[in-house]
Swiss-Prot record:
Keyword Repressor: no
Any one annotated GO CC term: cytoplasm
Name the record gives this protein: Chromosomal replication initiator protein DnaA
CDD domains documented for this protein: AAA, Bac_DnaA_C
InterPro entries membership: AAA+_ATPase, Chromosome_initiator_DnaA, Chromosome_initiator_DnaA-like, Chromosome_initiator_DnaA_CS, DnaA_C, DnaA_dom, DnaA_N_dom, DnaA_N_sf
NCBIfam families documented for this protein: DnaA, PRK14086.1
Stretches for region Domain III, AAA+ region: 120-336
Region annotation (Domain IV, binds dsDNA) ranges: 337-458
Organism: Symbiobacterium thermophilum (strain DSM 24528 / JCM 14929 / IAM 14863 / T)
Subcellular location: Cytoplasm
Encoding gene per record: dnaA
Membership in a protein family: Belongs to the DnaA family.
Length: 458
């Protein structure tokens, strides 16, 4: 009997797992996703060009054999990196085993959602994983409102902003939300480039009616990078009628672009005016706090412990692009894994030396250390120098001595002098005590990391 393409692909992966290592499956194959069947070719989305090369060179023959065993057909495979592929209306369903033979754990809800989705949306791009800050708060609120009540609030919703700022993330999040909360809704996500290519192919094949039906009979149309519609007169004409058909059916349209409608060159005025009918909102480059939060969220989602001094260094030096921001973190983590070294500030500087300007040595002073520690522990600057033995004062003083020893070139006598003329043996005792506490108390070690990050940021 016929069954979902995704279910067949899952069976194929399970079959492959019996003939290769589990590590290989988890690292390379498990993240792939079948996005369409065109004649006897299954189009499979992978996460990037490197993954595409790996799949083609290493696993494609095994997967083709698995498909032959399962479907009794000589299926071909085509791997595409970061796919935005719309299902072909003439695509043939795959012959598969009886549904009773499907592997355990196949998700019926997931398969049902895929049946209502044209195109590909990244499973990681949800509202829950989107980090909200001052630069994107309005766009996030508008996207969520549209997802909750499609075609009732802002229609169309037009989101614009620079490359890598989160426009596509929000569009995918809308798609996920609608599919999860509306059991009958049909969603299409497509890039303007793919829409154009599909339209050209439909003209060549004489299948424009099928093409039009596919896009005009959805409940939510998410179209990315609409600026690439500029100069394409025939595609603009087609999209104009698609836009009207969806609006007249009281369905939702969400559009993204790298610029507002009025700045898209050679765009027909009738399209420009329609893009301005609903709500236009922009996404700006994230501020430092948002960039830091994005990195921490990324690290948390990957299950990686990243010191604050590392995230602060990356967030401070990469200011305009979230993709570059996350890419830098990935590079640092990979660098640490390859060298089998802990993640540190110095390692991050080394890992990113080819993509970031060289760090100018910053002179950290004992005065700066004392100021940061005093603010953190709510004591006065003069408390570092007085003969006060209470723990509320003595312990922060020992911390400041330890940090002075670690972050400056000052000698032990010089450090002692800066802390009320204390003997160098007192400084040694303080450094040894704090070092021991760092080793035995992870929470305290995290506090020290935060203090170091703040000192370096001053």
């Amino acid at each position: 009997m016929k069954t979902e393409l995704s279910e067949v692909w899952q069976q194929c992966i399970d079959h492959l797992e019996r003939h290769t290592s589990k590590t290989a499956i988890e690292n390379w194959v498990r993240s792939t996703r079948p996005v369409a069947v065109v004649e006897d070719t299954i189009i499979v989305g992978v996460q990037g060009e490197f993954a595409k090369h790996r799949m083609e060179s290493r696993y494609a023959p095994l997967l083709r054999q698995a498909l032959r065993d399962l479907t009794k057909r000589n299926m071909q495979l085509k791997f595409v990196a970061n796919p935005n592929v719309i299902e072909d209306p003439a695509a043939e369903p795959v012959d598969a085993p009886n549904v009773a033979d499907l592997p355990a754990g196949t998700s019926a809800p997931a398969a049902e959602q895929n049946a209502r989705l044209l195109g590909y949306i990244n499973p990681k791009y949800t509202f829950e994983t989107f980090v909200v800050g001052n630069s994107n708060r309005f766009a996030h609120a508008a996207a969520l409102a549209v997802a909750e009540t499609p075609a009732r609030t802002y229609n169309p919703l037009f989101i614009y902003g620079g490359v890598g700022l989160g426009k596509t993330h929000l569009m995918h999040a809308i798609g996920h939300y609608v599919l999860q909360h509306n059991p009958t809704a049909k969603v299409a996500y497509v890039s303007t480039e793919t829409f154009t290519n599909e339209f050209i192919m439909a003209i060549q094949k004489g299948s424009t009616t099928a093409f039009q039906n596919r896009y005009r009979k959805v409940d939510v149309l998410l179209i990315d990078d609409i600026q690439f519609l500029a100069g394409k007169e025939a595609t603009q004409e087609e999209f104009y009628h698609t836009f009207n058909a969806i609006r007249e059916a009281n369905k939702q349209i969400v559009i993204s672009s790298d610029r507002p409608p009025k700045e898209i060159p050679t765009l027909e005025d009738r399209l420009r005016s329609r893009f301005e009918w609903g709500l236009i909102c922009d996404i700006q480059p994230p501020d430092l706090e948002t960039r830091t939060a994005i990195l921490r969220k990324k690290a948390q989602s990957e299950g990686i412990q990243v010191p604050d001094e590392v995230t602060n260094y990356i967030a401070t030096n990469i200011e305009t692009n979230i993709r570059e921001l996350e890419g830098a973190l990935t590079r640092v983590v990979a660098y640490a894994n390859m060298l089998k070294c802990p993640l540190t500030y110095d390692l991050a500087v080394q890992a990113l030396k080819d993509i970031l300007p060289p760090v100018r040595p910053k002179q950290i002073t004992i005065a700066t250390i004392k100021q940061v520690v005093a603010e953190h522990y709510n004591i006065r600057m003069q408390d570092f120098e007085v003969r006060n033995r209470s723990r509320a004062v003595a312990y922060p003083r020992q911390i400041a001595m330890y940090l002075a020893r670690e972050l400056t070139d000052s000698s032990l006598p010089k450090i002692g002098e800066e802390f009320g003329g204390r003997d160098h043996t007192t400084v040694i005792h303080a450094c040894e005590k704090i070092a021991k506490d760092i080793q035995s108390d992870p929470a305290f070690a995290h506090t020290i990391e935060q203090l170091i990050a703040r000192i370096r940021a001053e």
